[in-house]
Structures are given as structure tokens and as C-alpha cells.
Amino acid sequence: MLTRLTRPQALAVCAAPVAALLATAVFAPLPFSVAQPGMTADVLGENKGQQVITISGAPVRKTTGELRMTTIEATSPDTRVNLPQVIDSWFRTDEAVMPRDAVYPSGDDVREIEQYNQKQMKESQDEATRAALTYLGRENEGIDVTLKLADVGGPSAGLLFSLGIVDKLDGDGSGGDLTGGRVVAGTGTIDARGRVGAVGGVPLKTQAAKRDGATVFLVPRDECGEAKAELPDGLRLVPVTTLEGAVDALVALEKGTGTVPSC
């Protein structure tokens, strides 16, 4: 014998599976990582007790000021981010939701990711060294450059490595420092020809830079819009496309002459 359900009973029966589906959807892992401002490091100085840039085969200048490379800190590849976390991070300025594939393009295996990031870092350091020595016209002088930066992977410090090498070897070209005694931060890949490339997480990197005392931030020109959207007060954006352009901009800032590009 069939018993007809009352309207409230029918609604309750229908609501149960719908609620279960919603709960599953809300707490299901999503293909995202949550990132926040990471550490910065002065490439002209030491990081974790080791000199970041060591040069032999040529006189090295004593520098003032700082050139700070910047990073983001993302949830680990095996962390499962759900919808409430995504929504919470979406409305915060100190966090960003990024596709996991953009943060970890090599997959989810932690060891493989570390190897991939270290490979990218080594390639970036080699390119940065070649770019700097070529810019100075000293690529055939037997100058040896060693770059060390513990616990950091990826290619986004390339521009700052090149600038650090230039500052240590040549400064502004007339006896002064590229930084003008300032704390300058930035980000950007670089190739052997000195071309600067875009990176990810720029708004978070500007926050890290401001936190650690920077007043100037070098940004790949293609990412000006993203950098301006959430720019901390007191931080000046300087867009660059090449190593030569970055050096020229810093010299103009230091001397107070010439044109300093802006976003």
C-alpha cells in the first residue's frame, strides 16, 4: 500500500540529497592554490648566512642600498583548497587565488616540483649572469659569478640578479650605486639578451616589498595594470622591458635627471 507524502514530508525528502550535493560541492577540492606575500632577499647582501652574489676575476664595488628580489608563498601542491577558502581569499588583499597549474606547472609531486623549480632557478641565474656581463661588455674577461639563494625556486628573480651583478661591478657607471642608497625591490624573468619577462603574483610581491622597506618597485611593463590595482602607499612603480632600461631608470632616479618611466 502506497502512502502519499504530505508537502512538508516531500520537501524534506527532496531537500536531503540536494543538501548532500551542496555540502559535497562546497567542501570538494578545487584546482586552486592560495598565495600570500612571501620573503624578500637583498641580492647585494647575504641570505641565510651566505653571500647571494659572489664575483671573482674582477674588482668588486662596495655597495649601499638594497636590491630585493620578491616572492610569493603559496599553499603546498598537496593542499586541497575548497570553495569557502576561495571565497574568503577572493575578498582579501593580502591573499590571492591562483590556478594550481600556474603555481605548480610540473604537477603535484612535491619532489618533482622542487627539482623543477631549482632547475628554473639555475637557468635563470645563468641567463642573468650572461645578460649582466653582456650589458657591461665584459662577457669575455673571465669573470666568474656565483649566485646562491636558499629555499627559492623559479625564474622570477632574474632581473634582480642581473642588476645586482651590474651594481657590484660597475654601479651607475660613474662611481655611484644603482640604488642611490634606497631599498629597491622588483621582479621579472630575464634572458641572456637582457629582455625582461612577466611573472605571476605581482600584487602580492609589491606588498612583500613594502613590508620590507622598499620605496621603488621594478615591474615588467606588461604587468603594470595588475601591479597598480593594489599598490601599497609609498611604493613607486617603475616599468621595465630590458636590463638596460632598468639600469637607466635607476640611474635617473639616483641622479634626479632624465626620465623615469611610470605605469
Annotate the PLM regions.
Residues L2-C263:
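Peripheral, non-AAA+ core regions of ATP-driven protein-machinery
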